[in-house]
Each structure stands twice: as C-alpha cells, then as structure tokens.
C-alpha cells in the first residue's frame, strides 16, 4: 500500500509498527495463503513486542504485572496478604474497566471504524496488538532528543504526501518541533496545519502531578477517539 511504498523510500523515518493488520487486507486472497499470512503476522508481532518495553500500554498486560507484584508482596509480607489482595482486586477491577472502554472503541463492533494512527514514537505495539490499532511511526521527531531541521522536514514531507490530517505526539516531544510541523503543514486544505493529539507513554513522570496510570490511559483513549473522529 502507499504507506509501505513510502517506507521503502524512507526506512529511517517511517515505520509501520503493526504488521498483523496486513492479514485484514488479505482476506480476499486465496485461502491457501491465509496461514502463511497469519504466521508472518504473528512473527512480526512477536518481533515488535520483543523490542518494545511499553507493555503497560496494554491494560491486560499491566494487570498481569499487578498480579506478579501481588504475588511477591504476599510472599515478602504474609501478614499483610488480605490488604494486598483487597487493594489489588480493586485496582484490577479498574484495569478491566479501562480495557472495556478501549474495546468499546476498537473492537470489531467498536465506534472507531478507522483505526490507523500516525505517531512520532514507536511505543504502541502492545496497544496495537491488543486493540487492532495500526500505528505508523514517523521517526526523527521522537521525544528522546531535539529534532533537527532535516528531521522536521522529513516528517512534514511524509504528512503531506500521505494527506495526514492528525499527528499523534508523545507528551514530551520538543514544542518547537511540533510548532514547526504545524506551521509547515498549513495549506488551503488545512488552514491551521496538521492537527496535534497527544499520547502518554509514561516513561517519565507526568507533567501534571495529579495524573496517574488510569487517568493517562483514559486521556490516551479520549485523544485517540478525537483524532479518529469516533
């Protein structure tokens, strides 16, 4: 598709992080090829997840981590087992509710028929895998450093060539780079430039000290839905 073709030209700047979605495009092909596609997609996802540490962006994966913490705490402090279990159960119920909210948007019967997201940070493979969201990463403007003018120009080129109207930015991305991208994507079709929506990976403490995992994951969901129009 167009995204893949562009990726061949600029491998260092654009990456499709959710190869598993290729099998949805291939449903119309011969059944004999279906297993091969599934095998390829599973291998691609295993490779993506192996190099992506952001497992907590999948609420069910995070729930497994909570259970692991619970197991270790009750081993270390058996006298507090009842308290630990009660607290864990209450928190897990909230994680299950969060998962339900994401499924309401991104399941087969969810409200978001479009689930292709163009982002600036390759951090969302676990979320993509759980909720069938396709994340396309535009490299060079990630939050780890200050993007160069060339990095910004490459991002702008991709956004314009692919008619991207919404760009998802990780919270701590350079504000100057974000402003430059918006300014350079201004056109008659987008008088205000590309729309920016923020996503929170929680690699650093939140800028708002009142936020926590649950509130930031809800913000991620709200912003995903806002950008996708669902």
Task: Set out the residue ranges of the language-model regions.
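Extracytoplasmic metal-acquisition and chelation regions
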Residues: 1-230
């Amino acid at each position: 598709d167009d995204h893949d073709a562009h990726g061949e030209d600029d491998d260092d700047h654009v990456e499709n992080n959710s190869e598993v979605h290729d099998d949805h495009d291939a449903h119309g092909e011969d059944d004999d090829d279906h297993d091969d596609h599934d095998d390829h997609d599973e291998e691609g996802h295993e490779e993506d997840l192996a190099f992506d540490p952001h497992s907590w962006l999948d609420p069910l994966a995070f729930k497994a981590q909570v259970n692991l913490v619970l197991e270790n705490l009750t081993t270390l402090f058996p006298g507090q087992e009842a308290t630990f279990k009660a607290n864990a159960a209450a928190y897990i119920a909230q994680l299950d509710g969060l998962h339900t909210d994401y499924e309401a948007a991104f399941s087969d019967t969810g409200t978001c028929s479009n689930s292709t997201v163009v982002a600036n940070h390759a951090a969302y493979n676990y979320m993509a895998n759980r909720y069938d969201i396709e994340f396309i990463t535009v490299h060079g403007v990630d939050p780890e450093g200050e993007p160069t003018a060339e990095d910004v120009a490459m991002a702008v080129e991709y956004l314009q060539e692919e008619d991207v109207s919404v760009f998802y930015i990780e919270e701590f991305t350079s504000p100057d780079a974000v402003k430059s991208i918006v300014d350079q994507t201004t056109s008659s079709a987008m008088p205000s430039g590309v729309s920016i929506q923020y996503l929170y990976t929680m690699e650093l403490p939140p800028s708002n000290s009142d936020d926590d995992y649950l509130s930031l994951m809800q913000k991620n969901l709200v912003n995903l839905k806002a950008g996708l129009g669902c």
